[in-house]
Amino acid sequence: MQLNSTEISDLIKQRIESFDVVSEARNEGTIVSVSDGIIRIHGLADVMQGEMIELPGGRYALALNLERDSVGAVVMGPYANLKEGMKVTGTGRILEVPVGPELLGRVVNTLGEPIDGKGPIEAKLTSPVEVIAPGVIARKSVDQPVQTGYKSVDSMIPIGRGQRELVIGDRQTGKTAMAIDAIINQKDSGIFSIYVAIGQKASTIANVVRKLEEHGALANTIVVVASASESAALQYLAPYAGCAMGEYFRDRGEDALIVYDDLSKQAVAYRQISLLLKRPPGREAFPGDVFYLHSRLLERAARVNEEYVERFTNGEVKGKTGSLTALPIIETQAGDVSAFVPTNVISITDGQIFLQTELFNAGVRPAVDPGISVSRVGGSAQTKIIKKLSGGIRTALAQYRELAAFAQFSSDLDEATKKQLDHGQKVTELMKQKQYAPMSVFDQALVIFAAERGYLADVELNKLLDFEAALLSYARGQYAEFAAEIDKTGAYNDEVEAQLKKLTDDFVATQTW
């Protein structure tokens, strides 16, 4: 068979055109050192701060230090089989986590992967963990309440939707218990909850999940876990991942509550990473940007206006405001709120609930110290009936503390002082509350009404909690419609006051406690 030169050249041309070759530019580097979860990479020229770097075996590292001739990255997960000389690739992507209603009722790790054994999560959307907080114009003032179910908190230190309220205290003072009760109280309120566990024992987290399930609150809660056994990188990133999941609801006109338990451990994890990256240490060996670590996280908790929600959803959701309320927890050492991280977070948040060891050990639980606990914006969001009735509670407790200290030095007290001491003692007793027993608006209002109108004067101190239980049981039995109406509206007027007075008078007449 004879082929002429034209046919040969056509054949070669055809073969060349049909040859399947794809050229792609890859941003590659080489690991030059591995130590304590930190890798140094040479040759990654085109990499951005916070970029995901793909490692052999399908794992990832996070680029944190961009230096002249190397990149310092922190490995997210185990790093035992990483070796010098291994090739790594820049992905050009920032860390993203799955978000959406599909995560409700699930326990996930920092990367949004399920760890509860209930199968995969079919989330349709992902969101970057680092997002710039809404600007001033996009925000709306806080004027709707988040009921925690605690008499002492809802009456004296009210929390509003979109607020950041710090829960601070020593270890074993009931900080987690307060946050979990606040989540349990949201199960019928339409507020979604996210609980972020940072650096805690796995057994403690399992107990929290079990309690949420027992009380029917897990179905509208996402639990994000970075336990004590996880790497420092995952503990540092967990709050941002949880916040991204909460922002999904905020930006679509829903309300969400997020608990960070606790940010002290996140700061310690970040300190560990920073020191290993050879960043210069500052006060208490924390890096210079530890304030920014918490401020950029907590500023993302906000109440956003209707225009923001409408713009974000491309007009699908109209006339609805969204909110993300944050309850960060900080653990103090021996009650020292003037340490570096506590003062930082106090200055960032809109108030703090200080839990005191002495009160906790004295049986006052929740151990809220009304002296230094404050809510800077929650007053305007407080339920009307609680706001009208609870004005004297904080004053009574503050005066009682002062007089109790004074009374230790004096035996002969005048009648007015004795009366004040007795009232303060009874209000302190009345503020006690069992765990996993959040109270409705009506129950709180009725108890505070009884305290403020002098109905406790003839009740012995050791019978006070029996009096409270019997009063609430009587009210729910005899005045069920009235109770349901107050729970729904939270309204207060002369008619409501007269009804509360009649109810309490009727109960006192029965003498059944």
Curated annotation (Swiss-Prot):
ATP binds at G169, D170, R171, Q172, T173, G174, K175, T176. It catalyses: ATP + H2O + 4 H(+)(in) = ADP + phosphate + 5 H(+)(out). Its EC number is 7.1.2.2. The keyword Ion transport applies. It is a peripheral membrane protein. F-type ATPases have 2 components, CF(1) - the catalytic core - and CF(0) - the membrane proton channel. CF(1) has five subunits: alpha(3), beta(3), gamma(1), delta(1), epsilon(1). CF(0) has three main subunits: a(1), b(2) and c(9-12). The alpha and beta chains form an alternating ring which encloses part of the gamma chain. CF(1) is attached to CF(0) by a central stalk formed by the gamma and epsilon chains, while a peripheral stalk is formed by the delta and b chains. This is ATP synthase subunit alpha 1. Disulfide bonds: none annotated. The record marks S373 as: Required for activity. Its main location: membrane. One of its GO terms (molecular function) is ATP binding. It holds the Pfam family ATP-synt_ab. PANTHER family: ATP SYNTHASE SUBUNIT ALPHA, MITOCHONDRIAL. The keyword Glycosyltransferase does not apply. Belongs to the ATPase alpha/beta chains family. InterPro entries: ATP_synth_asu-like_sf (IPR023366), ATP_synth_asu_C (IPR000793), ATP_synth_asu_C_sf (IPR038376), ATP_synth_F1_a_nt-bd_dom (IPR033732), ATP_synth_F1_asu (IPR005294), ATPase_a/bsu_AS (IPR020003), ATPase_F1/V1/A1_a/bsu_N (IPR004100), ATPase_F1/V1/A1_a/bsu_N_sf (IPR036121). Keywords: ATP synthesis, ATP-binding, Cell inner membrane, Cell membrane, CF(1), Hydrogen ion transport, Ion transport, Membrane, Nucleotide-binding, Translocase, Transport. It is found in: Cell inner membrane. It is an enzyme of class 7 (translocase). GO terms for cellular component: plasma membrane; proton-transporting ATP synthase complex. The gene is atpA1. Gene3D superfamilies: 2.40.30.20, ATP synthase alpha/beta chain, C-terminal domain (1.20.150.20), P-loop containing nucleotide triphosphate hydrolases (3.40.50.300). Produces ATP from ADP in the presence of a proton gradient across the membrane. The alpha chain is a regulatory subunit.
